[in-house]
Regions:
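Short hydrophobic beta-strand that contains or immediately precedes a catalytic carboxylate
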Residues: 152-156
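Internal catalytic-core helix/loop-beta-alpha segment
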Residues: 134-148
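Structured helix-beta-strand junction loops
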Residues: 54, 148-149
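Substrate-contacting helices/loops that form the catalytic groove of nucleic-acid
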Residues: 203
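Rhodanese-like catalytic fold shared by cysteine-dependent sulfurtransferases
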Residues: 2-135, 158-197, 206-346
Length: 346
């Protein structure tokens, strides 16, 4: 089914500038659901038509197994947005997780993509039931697990996420940069704790929900996951006056790149490797676009580049950059692979 929505042909920078100039209040929310979607193309077209009409922005993944959405909705049209969402059979009763911070526009465009899975997991096991998940944990229960010496708390996020923020005492993925890598290895990583109580967590809940089902599939009996992830944990802690046991920032996959959960700064600048910082930047060299943690001094000295080579490459003529792009990216990937083993705890 083709969408009647007119394609937005503006460049990314043009969309970004338009969003920055739009002074209307917006609300950033995320939601997901594992639900059977028979016709993903029709479902996508339905979402695109309505959400374009409502001027929504965001990044949404649709698959036969469900939906994963991070969105930016006009505040004065949120009730209209919610009423329409709740009227869709696949989405009825869905709950939203609101952003902790709204410092800058979280999204500059609306992108709804059909994917094989709502979260790339690297699994190819027809016997795996993604709906057979572990029980939920509230924020209070999560705190109890953290305080329990017999319980294990495991971070289902990537290493660069855990680097800037994590729960006290959590086991973190020191050299794993994708959920696909981590999920496959999680049963092996946790096998020595198989008979203990295990609590897993992620940003908004979707990754640890699937991970809890995967651990149960691999014989783990007592696996629970934090309902609503770190985002909803922060809300519950604030509303219920609970101790906050999450230290640092919650990394988010939008233009903000993070939400401050506590005042603790637990990461170190990747460039000088001395100054404490938890601010992420993308390398100014668009061929590289490497995500790195930088301090104010290094940002000023390096000009927004993650390495001297990137500054040099960015000064080359456009045609020359196109020629070297493939080889340069291969070099950068190799460099990053080396760096991954040195991120957490630097």
């Amino acid at each position: 089914m083709k969408s009647a929505v007119v394609k937005d042909l503006r460049s990314r920078e043009e969309k970004r500038q338009a969003a920055l100039l739009d002074t209307r209040a917006r609300t950033t929310v995320s939601f997901y659901r594992y639900v059977q979607i028979a016709d993903t193309a029709e479902f996508r077209a339905r979402l695109l038509a309505k959400w374009s009409e409502l001027e929504c922005l965001g990044r949404i993944y649709v698959a036969s197994e469900g939906i994963n959405a991070q969105m930016n909705v006009l505040t004065d049209r949120f009730n209209e947005f919610d009423a329409w969402v709740q009227a869709q059979p696949e989405l009825k009763g869905i709950l939203y997780k609101s952003a902790v911070e709204e410092s800058v526009p979280s999204f500059f465009k609306l992108a709804i993509k059909i994917r094989p899975k709502v979260v790339a997991d690297g699994l190819n096991d027809n016997t795996f039931d993604v709906t057979n998940t572990g029980a939920y944990l509230t924020a209070k229960e999560m705190n109890d697990y953290i305080d329990d010496p017999e319980a294990v708390v495991f971070d289902m996020r990537n290493n660069y996420e855990a680097e800037v923020g994590r729960f006290e005492g959590a086991i973190t993925p020191d050299n794993l940069s994708t959920f696909r890598e981590e999920l496959v290895k999680t049963p092996e990583l946790l096998k020595i704790h198989k008979n203990k109580k295990i609590a897993i967590y992620c940003t908004g809940g979707i990754r640890c929900e699937k991970a809890s089902a995967w651990l149960k599939h691999n014989g783990f009996k007592d696996v629970r996951h934090l309902k609503g992830g770190i985002i909803d944990y922060a809300r519950q802690v604030k509303e219920e006056g609970l101790p906050n046991k999450f230290k640092g920032k919650n990394f988010v996959f939008d233009e903000r790149l993070g939400e401050r959960i506590s005042d603790d700064v637990i990461a170190t600048c990747h460039l000088c490797k001395k100054t404490k910082s938890d601010t992420h930047y993308h390398c100014k060299n668009q061929i590289c676009h490497n995500l790195y943690v930088g301090c104010d001094d290094c940002l000023k000295k390096k000009g927004g580049y993650c390495r001297a080579t990137c500054r040099w490459v960015n000064k080359l003529p456009p045609d020359t950059k196109k020629i070297i792009a493939r080889h340069y990216n291969r070099y950068v990937r190799k460099y990053r692979k080396f760096e991954k083993t040195r991120l957490v705890g630097v």
